[in-house]
């Protein structure tokens, strides 16, 4: 049987995600971001709620991406996620993308010329942002042109790089309906961005979300809920360069901007430059909020939930892969667990995220 991996945030889970799971084949394993997202934002609803939504709509097994995998630029995010799915035995990786290309061919190209391609990126001027450098590399070596704003396509290329040289087939699925950043309401499939923006519009949610009741009952947070905490962390830290990935230039810009910024959005606007994209700045602010330091990734994989089919698969991995299903005295990943505690500060009503939590079990398949 095919074992398909899917890398996801489900922020929140919508009909487009359900479509992706429906199109994927065989046993479906999802590696999902925890409570903070790849572009440096808190998840609108917590990881357990999102895992439950996925399991109710076609996923067989949901595991959590550690914080230092989930909040990263596309390449590291892709690499770390594929590493985890590879250990769980996937032979195919399904993903949504705006452009359906021969991603397999691109992966093969990277297998063959990876070193040369990375050298090309290293030699590009530092005035370019990392995404611009990556795009220049794909243009040079694969003749790819980037049309406007297509984050899923950028991630898809990161996945192609990550599976290079591994025994994993790529299964691109054309994105249906609204674009990633679209807030349009008159479409067949709404984007997660639109759902976050129209979260109080019940008719809209019911049209585009399969597990709408779960979403409506859950505590919801936005970046602004953490702004006072972020401000405190910036003001009370004499040397921001001790924080993961924060360099001197960024430390100075952030310290200056916090004097006048009245919101996270304003802070991001003030700090962003041509070279440092908004997503990168949001990631740095997330690292500062968490006081993140460089640390090793956890050996074990944290299981958030499974169906009967998923449980059987986990059983077959026993002894080969280190799995954590209950977090007790021994931490699974100290960094991610600290992040979860800070996430809970966003709203007093958010449930405990780790201690005493056990994987969600969905009995029917």
Curated annotation (Swiss-Prot):
- EC numbers on record: 6.3.4.-
Signal peptide range equals none
Q: Where in the cell is it found?
A: Cytoplasm
- Residues annotated for ATP binding in this entry: 7-20, 96, 152, 175
What UniProt keywords apply to this chain's record, in alphabetical order? ATP-binding, Cytoplasm, Ligase, Nucleotide-binding, RNA-binding, tRNA processing, tRNA-binding
- List, in alphabetical order, the GO biological process terms annotated in this UniProt record: tRNA modification
Determine if RNA-binding is one of this entry's keywords: yes
Reactions catalysed, semicolon-separated, are:
cytidine(34) in elongator tRNA(Met) + acetate + ATP = N(4)-acetylcytidine(34) in elongator tRNA(Met) + AMP + diphosphate
Query: What is its EC class?
Result: ligase
Quick one: where is this thing mainly located?
Answer: cytoplasm
One family name in Pfam for this protein: HIGH_NTase1
Question: Which InterPro entries does the UniProt record give?
Answer: Rossmann-like_a/b/a_fold, tRNA(Met)_cyd_acetate_ligase
Repeat in keyword set: no
Q: Name one GO cellular component term.
A: cytoplasm
GO molecular function of the protein, one example? ligase activity, forming carbon-nitrogen bonds
The family this protein is said to belong to: Belongs to the TmcAL family.
* Function description: Catalyzes the formation of N(4)-acetylcytidine (ac(4)C) at the wobble position of elongator tRNA(Met), using acetate and ATP as substrates. First activates an acetate ion to form acetyladenylate (Ac-AMP) and then transfers the acetyl group to tRNA to form ac(4)C34.
Write down the NCBIfam families for this protein, in alphabetical order: PRK13670.1 (NF010191)
- HAMAP family recorded: TmcAL (MF_01539)
This chain's protein is named tRNA(Met) cytidine acetate ligase
Q: Which organism is it from?
A: Streptococcus pneumoniae serotype 2 (strain D39 / NCTC 7466)
Name of the coding gene: tmcAL
């Amino acid at each position: 049987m095919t074992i398909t991996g899917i890398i996801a945030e489900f922020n929140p889970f919508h009909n487009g995600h359900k479509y992706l799971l429906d199109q994927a084949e065989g046993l479906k394993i999802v590696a999902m971001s925890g409570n903070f997202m790849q572009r440096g934002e808190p998840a609108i609803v917590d990881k357990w709620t999102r895992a439950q939504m996925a399991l109710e709509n076609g996923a067989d097994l949901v595991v959590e991406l550690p914080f230092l995998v989930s909040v990263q630029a596309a390449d590291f995010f892709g690499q770390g996620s594929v590493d985890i799915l590879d250990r769980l035995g996937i032979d195919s990786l399904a993903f949504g993308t705006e452009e359906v290309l021969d991603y397999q061919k691109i992966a093969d190209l990277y297998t063959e010329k990876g070193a040369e391609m990375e050298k090309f990126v290293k030699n590009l001027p530092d005035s370019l942002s990392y995404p611009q450098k990556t795009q220049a590399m794909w243009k040079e070596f694969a003749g790819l042109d980037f049309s406007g704003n297509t984050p899923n396509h950028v991630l898809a290329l990161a996945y192609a790089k990550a599976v290079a040289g591994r025994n994993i087939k790529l299964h691109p699925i054309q994105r249906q309906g609204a674009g990633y950043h679209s807030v349009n309401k008159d479409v067949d499939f709404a984007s997660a961005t639109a759902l976050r923006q129209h979260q109080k519009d019940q008719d809209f949610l019911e049209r585009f979300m399969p597990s709408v009741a779960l979403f409506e009952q859950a505590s919801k947070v936005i970046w602004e809920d953490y702004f006072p905490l972020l401000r405190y962390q910036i003001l009370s830290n004499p040397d921001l360069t001790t924080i993961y990935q924060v360099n001197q230039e960024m430390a100075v810009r952030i310290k200056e901007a916090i004097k006048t910024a009245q919101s996270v959005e304003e802070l991001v606007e003030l700090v962003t430059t041509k070279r440092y994209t908004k997503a990168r700045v949001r990631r740095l602010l997330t690292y500062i909020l968490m006081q993140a330091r460089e640390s090793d990734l956890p050996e074990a994989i944290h299981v958030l939930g499974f169906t009967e089919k998923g449980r059987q698969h986990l059983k077959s991995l026993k002894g080969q892969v280190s799995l954590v299903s209950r977090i007790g005295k021994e931490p699974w990943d100290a960094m991610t667990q600290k992040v979860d505690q800070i996430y809970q500060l966003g709203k007093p009503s958010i449930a405990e995220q780790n201690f005493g939590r056990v994987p969600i079990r969905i009995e029917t398949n």
